[in-house]
Amino acid sequence: MFALKFILITSFIASTALAHFTLDFPESRGFVSDIEGQFCGGFSTVGPRQPFPLGSGPVHINSHHSLATVVAFISTSSNPTSFDDFNTTSNGTIIPLASNIFQVTQGEKCFNIDLESLNVGLTNGSEVTLQIQYDGGDGDLYQCSDLVLIQGYEVPSNETCTDDASRTSNASSTSSGSATATSAAATSSSSGTSGAIKEVVGLGALSLALGIAGLIIL
């Protein structure tokens, strides 16, 4: 009986450890579960840039956890190599978060981001890298996608997002990037004290706090 319980507990822990997420649209640089906890999910080289709306555009993920916390942020560097590259533009302008910090349940989820509204000088043809940070309770995971922003670009009809998870989950922070909204839940390798702070670490603690607060989630 003890052996059976041990096997069941071990199996549960193993299955939990294997739970991850995928970035399905825009397409991720790549996915290897064992290295998803690294910067850009372990894929540090810029890939082919995909067209993406300069204005509002959809992001689709597949969550493998029963509950997880998600946030999106961007870099305007042509070759981002660290989280610092997602903090400021080349002229020192602080880059706000690209999404709210929000929660999702297991399954396919989507949310919309409006990169033009970040007011960091993005225009038609701007090249950015989108990074998604995801925490299902067993550590932060990451996925990156390299984009070229197109004014008026229409995504395929099957990729639109009408059930926006970042809005229906009563997100804890807005994309305005204010330090007040993010500092309680985030730290950074950067010493800046204003604007968005990335990487947003400690999402697990934030998930717990949001759960206790009784947020409405998808």
Swiss-Prot record:
Q: Which cofactors, if any, are listed as required?
A: Cu(2+)
**Where do Low complexity bias regions lie?**
167-194
Lipid attachment of type GPI-anchor amidated serine occurs at which residues? Answer: 190
The UniProt entry lists membrane topology as:
Lipid-anchor; GPI-anchor
The record, for CDD domains, names: LPMO_auxiliary-like (cd21176)
Q: One MF term from GO for this chain?
A: metal ion binding
User: Annotated region Disordered: where?
Assistant: 160-194
Q: Which InterPro entries match?
A: BIM1-like, BIM1-like_dom
Q: Where found?
A: Cell membrane
Write down how the cofactor binds this protein: Binds 1 copper ion per subunit.
Propeptide intervals in chain numbering: 191-218
A GO CC term?
side of membrane
Q: Which residues form the signal peptide?
A: 1-19
Give me the residues that bind Cu(2+), please: 20, 65, 138
Glycosylation site positions: 87, 91, 124, 158, 170
Keyword tags: Cell membrane, Copper, Disulfide bond, Glycoprotein, GPI-anchor, Lipoprotein, Membrane, Metal-binding, Signal
The chain's disulfide connectivity reads 40-144, 110-161
**Similarity annotation:** Belongs to the X325 family.
- Its job: Lytic polysaccharide monooxygenase-like protein that has diverged to biological functions other than polysaccharide degradation since it does not perform oxidative cleavage of polysaccharides. Cell surface-bound protein that functions in the copper-accumulation pathway shared by the CUF1-dependent copper transporter CTR1. Involved in maintaining cell wall integrity during copper deficiency. Binds Cu(2+) with an estimated 1:1 stoichiometry and might serve as an extracellular copper ligand.
Protein's recorded name: Copper acquisition factor BIM1
Q: Which organism is it from?
A: Cryptococcus neoformans var. neoformans serotype D (strain JEC21 / ATCC MYA-565)
* Encoding gene per record: BIM1
